[in-house]
Structure formats: structure tokens, C-alpha cells
Design a protein with these regions (language model features):
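C-terminal non-catalytic regions of proteins with extracellular/luminal or membrane-system context
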Residues: 5, 13-172
Length: 172
């Protein structure tokens, strides 16, 4: 019970965040996340990754080292988030090389117009993608973290395309 209607203009948002983000709710959220994942294809049984067989792992993508993509305006914002890059660094065995390159920004300089009109890659964009590809070639496995953000998804964020925004398809 949050008492929203007892004193509707005197809410302590920090206390509300603590209540919503309690240990019990964290466990429920974790279980819901586990149960909502669907693996469509596991070619050559690559998953789950075996940390003992990986000496070098490439991580790329605009959301790989980004916390904000995991948060929404529909829940508590004062929560601790582990980025995919941090999670990988925490899980691999000591001595494993983790090569990170962003690869591209979430959206390109011409976005949102670039959803309708294809612009050529700039030299800087191509260079960043090339770095990510080189890291992938040198690695045992590559994790690519793509998607949207509150800038590209949400209320009042209508888009003309369901494709990944920016240069993410070029990176992939």
C-alpha cells in the first residue's frame, strides 16, 4: 500500500522507489525475465556459453555499455543496473580478453529522416563498424547488443519503420 490517495500531493518518491524495488519484487522480476526469454535458434549448440572455452570475447553495440535501455518511465528509476558489458566482464574467467567497441550510435546524425531516406555511411561510422568487425574476427565469440531506447521507443515516439534505428543493421 503506497497511500497515493491518502495525501496525493505529499508522496516521497524515494521511499516509493525503495518499496517497489524491494528484494521480493526483484526476485519476481528476475523470474519473469527468465520465463519470458525465447531461444529461436541455437546453431551448433553455442549457448549457453562455456566460459572455460572462451579466451577472447568481443562485445559491441550501442546498448552494450548502456544502463538506460533497461529502465522505463513505468517503474522505479532508482535501481541498480548491470550493463551487458559489465555482466560479461563479471562472468568470464580471469585472464579472458573482453574487447569492447560500440560499433555505432543508437541513431545516426540524420535520424529520424534516415528511416525514410538512406544516407551513405560516413567515414567515421564505417571506421567504428570496421573496428567492431575486427574485434569479432579475433574473438572466440561475439555478443552484439542492439535495440532502442527511450529516444526511439515509447509513448509519442511513432516511427515509420520497425527496423533497428541508425546504423545498427550495418553493424550486424
Amino acid at each position: 500500500r503506497q497511500g497515493l490517495f491518502d495525501h496525493p500531493y505529499q508522496i516521497d518518491l524515494k521511499e516509493t522507489d525503495k518499496e517497489v524495488n524491494c528484494a521480493e519484487n526483484q526476485l519476481v522480476a528476475l523470474q519473469a525475465s527468465k520465463e519470458s526469454l525465447v531461444l529461436l535458434k541455437n546453431q551448433d549448440a553455442v549457448l549457453p556459453l562455456d566460459v572455460n572455452k572462451i579466451s577472447k570475447i568481443a562485445v559491441c553495440g550501442p546498448n552494450a555499455d548502456e544502463e538506460a535501455y533497461a529502465l522505463t518511465h513505468y517503474g522505479p528509476l532508482a535501481v541498480e543496473v548491470t550493463t551487458v558489458l559489465e555482466g560479461i566482464r563479471n562472468k568470464v574467467k580471469p585472464g579472458t580478453d573482453v574487447l569492447f567497441t560500440k560499433g555505432c550510435d543508437l541513431v545516426d546524425a540524420n535520424w529520424p529522416e534516415s528511416e525514410l531516406i538512406r544516407y551513405p555511411l560516413t567515414a567515421e561510422e564505417q571506421s567504428e563498424i570496421d573496428k567492431a568487425v575486427e574485434n569479432a574476427k579475433k574473438s572466440d565469440v561475439t555478443v552484439v547488443v542492439l535495440g532502442g531506447s527511450n529516444r526511439t521507443c515509447g509513448e509519442n515516439k511513432s516511427r515509420s519503420s520497425l527496423d533497428l534505428p541508425g546504423r545498427q543493421l550495418d553493424l550486424l
